[in-house]
Amino acid sequence: MIKKFFLVDKFYLTAFAILIPTSINLSITQFVTPLLNAIMGRTDNPAISISSYSIAISVLFLIALPNLRIQHLTIVYYKNINKLKVHFFVILISTICLFCSVLIIYTPASNIFLEKIFFTEGDLRNNVEKCLKLGFYIPFLLIIKMHLYAVAIVSSKSSLIWAGTIFGFICTFLLAIIFYLIGFEGFRLGISAVAYSLALETLAIFMLVRNDLLDFKLKFTRDIFMVGDLFKFFTPLLFAAFIPSFTMPAINAVLTRLDNPEVSISAVNIGIGIFGAVSFAIYGCQSTILSLMSNGYHYFKIRYFSYFVSFLTLFLCSFIAWINPVNHFIFNTIFNLDEDLYKNTLLVFRLLSFLPPFLVMEQLYVGIIMNSKSTNPIIYINICRFLVLIIFLGASIFLLQNGALVGGLAWSLTLFFEAIFAWLFGKNIKKPD
């Protein structure tokens, strides 16, 4: 049966060939951040440097939020309409984000972000401002890069995804080492390595996919600039990207009101991070599902493949969560968590460990909704998810005192119900043949 699954039906080999590099590409930040932190930790004033870089990059990634969804739009539309129209829309969105970046960083609006939202002052504020000015163009490049990777995904050219991702990672590492040896300040080292490597990676993936970017049989018409249909498709996706970004701040706000908030907040953040690293394959499921649909593969094959990946991930998460020598090695030996933090982090991880099939279920049905090109249900799904989060957090203040339990349940319940709502809204939509 295993032989038949992998060798006879080449669909599964094709699917894995797209999934693995796409998942690594989308989760590469989880590998780059510790690397940069380790190098910045060897510079003068490492705490301020790492904090300055972290705040600055979080602001830039918030401005670049459309990059999380531009890949999905590209995959859905690239083979169905004039490619030039998709390219124009991506350039338009990236230019708008660049304008927002300049407006926020180079005008008095920066004071609102740095002083009122992030409460920075003194050297920390000055360093964050310098970081932002060094990397103001990062949102523009991020959106362009994700669009180019989407072209490689929808063209089923996994080798190009591997090449671009590995090249970008190596560039980041080498540039960070070079800037360290030159004597850059820590925060300048971090933001410069990310910005320059991003520019090089974007150029590299552009060169790799250049033959798939244009179709010379297509005519340059006025319709290329009429992108109202793409905005209509994209707006719900952007809304869906904003809602999850409020989940962690909302949970942290509640945890500060419960017992032992420092340990609880740390446990929830570490638990989520470890779960994300263990379940990294799921990061690429959405793009893989959309690519397979776009290339005409049968829905039932896509569904079987997606759930196969989810149950493999479920097995791995359960193995770590419930086999004591394994979780002790990871949480205590590798992450050096003390007894109290270890127990609370393990509790969070166990509460999340059952989620992989539901995470894939949500991505599958949202993929069906996207493939239909009518994305309004995605707004309703995320509103329902947000209501579940608010209701649970409101009740937990009065009913529960264990912060790790509240944080873990908040994440697991909202993601579980998001999958249920996705199924409810997507089950009656026509599946791709």
PLM features: what roles do these ranges have?
Residues 47, 81, 154-155, 183-184, ...:
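Helix-loop interface residues and adjacent transmembrane-helix termini in multi-pass membrane transporters
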Residues 100-129, 316-346:
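Short membrane-interface helical motifs at transmembrane helix boundaries
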Residues 52-101, 145-154, 268-320, 362-370, ...:
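Small-residue-rich hydrophobic transmembrane alpha-helices
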Residues 169-202, 386-420, 424, 428:
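Membrane-interface helix-loop junctions in multi-pass transport and translocation proteins
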Residues 122-148, 278, 339-365:
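Alpha-helical transmembrane segments of multi-pass membrane proteins
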Residues 97-211, 384:
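Hydrophobic transmembrane helix module of multi-pass membrane transport proteins
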Residues 1-18, 126, 191-194, 199, ...:
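Interhelical loop/hinge segments that connect adjacent transmembrane helices in multipass membrane
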Residues 20-72, 138, 235-291, 316-317, ...:
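Transmembrane helix-bundle signature of multi-pass secondary active exporters and lipid flippases
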